[in-house]
Structure formats: C-alpha cells, structure tokens
Regions:
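A detector of single, family-specific signature residues
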Residues: 1-414
Length: 414
C-alpha cells in the first residue's frame, strides 16, 4: 500500500479533521468528522485565550462524536501560525500541512468559483486532507530549531548585503568607473577598504603614485603591487567619472561601506553560533566526513531538514527540498524532465552550492558529475543531479550513523 492510500485510510477511520485558515490577528477553524458531521467555520483569536477556545471546541466534538484520532491541518504559512503550532505540539493530535498551491487549485472545484474567503478556505484545506494530499509537519526542536533560525537570518543578511553591494557598484560606476575594471569589482575586502579611504579619482591623484602603491600593497597584504597601482593612478588621471553632485554620492558611499562592514561582522557572529549549535547534533560528524562539506553547509541542511529520523525514505526528503522530478507529456509530445521546486528553497540553494564543492578535483562527486557532462547533460542540470545524489548520501549517513568512505565498494572488495 502506497503512502497516499495509507493517508486516505487513516482519515476514514473514526477521524476528525480540523482545518485552520491562519490569519495575522484571527484564525478561522472548521471541523469535519468521519461520518460527515461538520461544525461550520468559526473564528478564534491568535492569542492564548483564542487557542484555548479552539481546543475546547475540538475536545467537546471529540467526546460527542466518539472520535479516536484528530488531524489538524493548515497551509504552509508564514510566522503568523507558529504560536498556534507550538501550542498544539503537546496535544494528542496529528499536525499536517497542505501546499498553498493545492488550496488555490482545489477551491475552484469546491463551488466552481475563484471566490476566496476565510470561511471557504478551511473547508478546502479539509478536502485536501481528506483526499490524502497532506504532508507531515516537521518542527525542529532544540539545536535544530536554533540552526534553522540562524540559517534563515544569515540568508536574509546576505541578501541585504548583496543589495548594498549592488548600490555601491552603481555609485562607483558614476564617479570612478575605471576602478571597477582594474580592481575587478568591489566585493573584495581590498576594494572596500581602498574605497573607504580614497573613493574618487582626485583622492588618488592627491595621494601620489608612490603612496598609492604602498597603500594598495598594505591593504591587499601584498596581493596587489605597483603594477596595479600604476594602472589605477593612470585611470584616475584619465577618469570619465562625473563631478556634479559628488558630495552627496560620497556621503552615500561612506554609509554603504559602513553597513557592509557591519553586516559582515554580524554574519561572522551568526556562523560562530551555528558552529556551536552544530556540536549539539550527534550525527553532524558523519555529514562532515564528506570531503568538501563544511560546518556552515551542514548547519544549514540540518536546520532546514530538522530531524532526519522523521523521514521514512529518501524520496520524502528529496521532495522536501523540491528536487523531485516531473514532466508534462501528452500524446506524442514528450515533456522535459524538471525539478518541482515546491520544497524548501533555502535547502535547495544550500545543496546546489554544496554540489559545486563536491565536484571539484578529488571531490566525492567529481567523477559522477563529469560522467553526466560527457553524456551530454547541461552543467546546471548536472549540478542539480549532484544535489539530489548528495542529499540521498547525507540522508543515508545521518540515518545509519556512519562516516563517509570514499570508493566504499572498492575498499570493501579489497
């Protein structure tokens, strides 16, 4: 019996479905029993008093209708639903979630109308659960919960930093475009430190060639010498950068560089904390045995997955990452095979960048990747294939509590 059939069977055996449409201040609940009896949608506040009222309503219905099992489901939502979810974790219920995309599509089948209301949505969610199209809700606890929060925070800060760097790039392009060519961008510490002290061509000319060479060599710790200094000095003398409004531009450049420095420091603090919490995860050492997989990557994966023991097979965890394959074919038309991208996007991103490390020379997936390329697969698709294989490997090591052994089959045969 497949998993979907099992889920449908569970719902049909003296089970009550409670579906919730999560809101910012108020939630809408709905109850449906296995025998068809239902309690029409009702509102309850998103606070402790509202949670108690909701639970009392469920408990009364359970006693009246002699219910053996309660399934409470909601859409995969934002932070609004987290307090309610944590309140229900200690209750004798099964918590499940449904894909918002499924809700959007099924609601038209409900009454042949695209109408969306707070009273209609929980009924649609209940329908989806009754069809067996629900997923178990996995809530990280302890160190895993800390890692998820830290990893999400790190992603947001990196996104903000990227936006700042793009703004800085456009400003420098206006007043000193040649700098970007000679220094090959502004992301490096050398570029940022030099810009902080000498942001304009006039600043470099006033400093003088010899001093530019010394300053550049010191800032870059010997990476850039007098050859770069000469090119930079000549570029400053012949720069086509604008002069008008430069004072305002320099004020913004100073602010952005300070912000980038501050965010770099905060990212370092986050990563330090992530490494500390990773030590509290017993199976993390098995994942770190994979060459090319470092502590921050493992922390991010564990934070997104939670507990590997909650997943029964590799297929389930592949689906969580949105790396499960699908195609759209009809008649003689053969569709392209693609990944669904319906799982956790940060997990998928972490695996993709991890794949770039494990395909390097002497990496654990180097041969596998190049075999795919030699067989005509595009590089990006090959990296996605490596991501899938890497996640299956990580799942196996975590579940079996084993260290990675390169060329295991060859060594075991020796």
């Amino acid at each position: 019996m497949n998993n979907k059939r099992k889920r449908i069977q569970i719902v049909n055996e003296k089970v009550m479905i409670s579906a919730i449409d999560i809101g910012k201040n108020k939630n809408t609940g709905y109850l449906r029993c296995y025998n068809g009896v239902e309690i029409k949608p009702f509102e309850f506040s998103n606070n402790k008093k509202g949670f108690k009222e909701f639970w009392e309503k469920i408990f009364r219905a359970r006693v009246i209708h002699k219910i053996d099992k309660i399934i409470i489901g909601f859409e995969s939502t934002s932070s609004y639903g987290e307090p309610l979810i944590h309140y229900l974790l200690d209750k004798p219920v099964q918590l499940v979630q449904v894909n918002p995309m499924h809700t959007k599509r099924v609601k038209e089948l409900h009454d042949n109308s695209p109408l969306k209301t707070d009273t209609k949505d929980p009924k649609v969610i209940a329908d989806i659960i009754q069809f067996g199209h629900y997923l178990s809700l996995v809530i990280p606890k302890g160190a895993s919960a800390q890692l998820r929060r830290l990893n999400n925070c790190r992603e947001r800060i990196i996104k903000n930093r990227t936006a700042l760097i793009n703004r800085l790039h456009s400003l420098v392009c206006a007043i000193f475009p040649e700098f970007l060519v000679i220094m090959k961008g502004i992301r490096s510490k050398t570029s940022l430190r030099f810009l902080k002290n000498y942001p304009t061509p006039d600043d470099i000319i006033k400093l003088g060639f010899e001093s530019v060479g010394i300053e550049l060599k010191n800032i870059s710790r010997g990476k850039f010498g007098f050859d770069h200094a000469k090119r930079l000095f000549e570029a400053a003398k012949n720069s086509v950068g604008i002069k008008e409004g430069i004072e305002s531009i320099l004020m913004e450049i100073e602010y952005i560089i300070k912000e980038i420095h501050s965010q770099n420091q905060f990212i370092d603090q986050i990563e330090k904390k992530m490494k500390q919490y990773l030590k509290d995860i017993p199976y993390s050492r098995y994942l770190l045995s994979i060459k090319g997989i470092k502590e921050i990557t493992v922390s991010g994966i564990i934070g997104e997955v939670g507990n590997f023991e909650d997943f029964h097979n590799q297929k389930a965890i592949i689906k969580l990452a949105g790396l499960n394959l699908y195609e759209v074919s009809s008649g003689e038309h053969k569709g392209k095979i693609q990944i669904s991208k319906r799982g956790r996007s940060i997990l998928r991103k972490t695996l993709f960048f991890a794949s770039m490390n494990v395909i390097r020379k002497d990496g654990v997936m180097h041969d596998y990747y190049h075999n795919l390329i030699n067989n005509g697969m595009l590089k990006k698709k090959a990296l996605i294939a490596v991501s899938r294989k890497l996640l299956r490997l990580i799942f196996s090591l975590a579940r079996n509590k084993r260290y990675y052994i390169h060329n295991y089959s060859l060594k075991s045969a020796a």
